[in-house]
Amino acid sequence: MKTVLTVVGLLAFSIPYACQGLSPRVIAISLLILLFSYLMLLPSLKPLIATLADNPLLTLLMMYIAASCLWAEQEQTSSMLMVLKFVTFSTFGLYLVTHYTTQGCIRLLVITLSILSVLNLLAVVLVPSFAIHGGVEHTGLWKGISGHKNTLGTLSLLCFVSHVIYFFRGTRKALHVGFVLLNALLLIKCQSTTSLLLTSSLFMFILFILLFKRIRSVSLRGFFISSSCLLVLLGIVFAFSYGDAIASEFGKTTTLTGRTEIWQGIAGAIDSHYWFGHGYGSFWANRPSIYANGIRFDLTSSHSGFRDLWIDIGLTGMLATITLAMTTLFKFRIGKTDMYTWLTAAVFFLFIVLNNITDSRFLNSLAIYWIIFVVIVIKVQERHRQTVAEKEITTSIQHASITLETTNRTARKKEPRFPAP
């Protein structure tokens, strides 16, 4: 029953109609999930406190985001409700990491994403007027129950790459092939360029890691890494040299569909609250109009997660988040133990970091992205701490063994030797 309710909670955080906005429906769902998380965490306060203590930067960041309501520019009640939502999905993330192993957390996320992909397809088939974009913008493109083609693209991307990894694990291959094909269809029909590019990049990363793990020779591994780096470098040079031509082939421009113009337009909003931001959710809640190069943009985000962090919680909060992301990436180890679980976690985390460059997937979007971020940061730190402790124990044992052997040798040398009769 606990697992079912956990998946239901993750689904609620993955559907806009259940977690976005401040409608009575969203607040009621948030309160129910917060109550569930509280009841589950209450008997295990000791592991919770230990988890928070082992992740001081993440703990301080969450407290800082919640406290930003004190200087938020929107109406106080709305600001408090925004903080309530943040506390809800952060608490749910803490519940996940204290009650499930890394393998269990990743498994629950994959199950949730798989259910979402089926629901998105059913919505398109059964209620096309609701699940397919109409009007002038994005006409005919699929959005499913995700509310927007780009959101559908990101969720389908995560489901696609996770089932690719699970396919290589070697169990239930037919099931994983089915979900790979389903999410490939969703990615194609939503036509989210960012998601398609990230899917291709992460797919190549998965193949690189799996091939690298199969190579035993040190010299071959070195050749494989250097060749891969050379190919990536050539790809970057090619993209910079022929970026305009490549973008035009896909009906795009190097302004990233107007994103660079939007980023110019929000420069004033960042400068006016440079260090501490406007308060969590405050700036975009007022639906400001952004002007850049004579163009007016009516938006709910800057289409950049890092810039939205800067707007919401200032340079202080953004740098804390970047530090968390970088230290987590450096601590990642994909070893033989639970290799496929940790590879899935690494791909999810890379997606969060990369996607937030040109899209907003930290706090100003579905809560599932923040939950993934929190879960992986904590689990990587937990594994890193265990690895360090194991190394210290091994070193202590080796040191004690060497000391004992040295003592024994010294004792043998000091023993009196009597001549043979």
Task: Place the predicted regions along the sequence by residue.
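N-terminal signal-anchor transmembrane segment
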Residues: 1-43, 61-73, 352-354, 420
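Transmembrane alpha-helices of multi-pass inner-membrane enzymes
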Residues: 33-36, 343-355, 361-409, 421
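Hydrophobic transmembrane alpha-helices and their immediate junctions
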Residues: 45, 170-173, 206-208, 212, ...
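Aromatic-anchored transmembrane helix interface
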Residues: 54-63, 75-98, 110, 117
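Alpha-helical transmembrane segments of multi-pass inner-membrane proteins
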Residues: 105-134, 146-212, 327, 331
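Flexible juxtamembrane loops connecting transmembrane helices in multi-pass membrane enzymes
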Residues: 137-141, 145, 218-223, 233-265, ...
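A conserved mid-to-late transmembrane alpha helix and its immediate loop/hinge
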Residues: 184, 191-195, 264, 297-332, ...
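Long extracytoplasmic/lumenal interhelical loops at the membrane interface
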Residues: 248-264, 268-313
